[in-house]
C-alpha cells in the first residue's frame, strides 16, 4: 500500500475551509493512512500490553458546523469503543503528529487511575523519558514536556483525574510537521513504536485497577 508516513498534503487538510470540504479530503487521504497505521500497530500494542487491541479510526460523525482540527486512530482492548478506556492514539494536527497514551474524560475509572498514578509517581518519572509530553486536554494541541515539569506538576495532573469530572491525562511524543516530512517511512514507524514501548508502562499500570 502507499506510505504510512504523513505528507504535506495530509497536514494541509486541516487548513481547508468548511466542514464538507475538509471532511471530503480527510476521508480520501488521511483516514486510509490512519487505518493503515492502526492495522500496523494493533499487533504491536497487543504484544506490548498483553491485551488484544482493536483499531478505532476517528469518524467525527457528530460534527455539523465546525470542521475537525485534528484526526487520529485509537487503540483499545474493546471492539465497540475506546473513549471510556485507557487507550493509545496516533494522530495529527496541522502542525505536528502526536502519539499518546490517553485517559480522557469519558473514563468511569479516572479517580482510581489518578490515585494509582499518584502512588506510582516516582516510577512514572523514571520510566517515561524526559523528552515526552504531558497534556491535560486531548482537544487542544498544547502539551508540556516532562523535563519542564516537576514532581508537583505531575502530581497535580493526576490529582485532577481524582477530583475534576472533565479532567484528562495524556502522555506521549509530538513530532513536528518538518520532522515528519524529513523522515523515511521506516524511521517514522520506528519512532512511533519506540514511543509505544515506553508508554506501555502506563497502560500496564492501569491494568492493576479491577474493572
UniProtKB/Swiss-Prot annotation:
Source organism (scientific name): Bacillus licheniformis (strain ATCC 14580 / DSM 13 / JCM 2505 / CCUG 7422 / NBRC 12200 / NCIMB 9375 / NCTC 10341 / NRRL NRS-1264 / Gibson 46)
InterPro entries for the chain: UPF0637, UPF0637_domain_sf
Protein name per its UniProtKB record: UPF0637 protein BLi01683/BL05149
Pfam family, one: DUF1054
Family in the record: Belongs to the UPF0637 family.
Domain of life of the native organism: Bacteria
Amino acid at each position: 500500500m502507499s506510505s504510512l508516513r504523513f505528507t504535506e498534503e495530509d497536514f494541509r487538510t486541516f487548513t481547508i475551509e468548511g466542514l464538507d470540504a475538509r471532511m471530503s479530503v480527510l476521508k480520501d487521504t488521511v483516514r486510509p493512512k490512519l487505518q493503515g497505521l492502526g492495522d500496523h500497530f494493533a499487533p504491536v500494542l497487543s504484544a506490548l500490553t498483553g491485551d488484544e487491541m482493536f483499531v478505532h479510526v476517528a469518524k467525527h460523525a457528530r460534527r455539523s458546523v465546525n470542521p475537525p482540527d485534528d484526526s487520529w486512530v485509537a487503540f483499545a482492548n474493546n471492539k465497540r469503543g475506546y473513549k471510556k478506556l485507557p487507550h493509545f492514539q496516533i494522530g495529527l494536527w496541522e502542525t505536528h503528529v502526536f502519539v499518546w497514551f490517553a485517559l480522557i474524560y469519558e473514563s468511569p475509572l479516572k479517580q482510581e487511575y489518578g490515585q494509582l498514578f499518584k502512588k506510582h509517581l516516582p516510577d512514572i518519572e523514571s520510566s517515561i523519558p524526559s523528552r515526552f509530553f504531558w497534556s491535560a486536554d486531548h482537544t487542544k494541541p498544547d502539551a508540556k514536556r516532562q523535563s519542564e515539569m516537576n514532581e508537583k506538576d505531575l502530581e497535580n495532573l493526576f490529582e485532577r483525574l481524582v477530583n475534576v469530572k472533565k479532567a484528562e491525562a495524556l502522555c506521549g511524543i509530538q513530532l513536528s510537521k518538518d520532522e515528519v516530512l524529513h523522515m523515511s517511512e521506516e524511521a517514522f514507524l520506528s519512532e512511533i513504536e519506540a514511543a509505544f514501548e515506553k508508554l506501555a508502562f502506563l497502560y500496564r499500570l492501569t491494568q492493576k485497577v479491577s474493572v
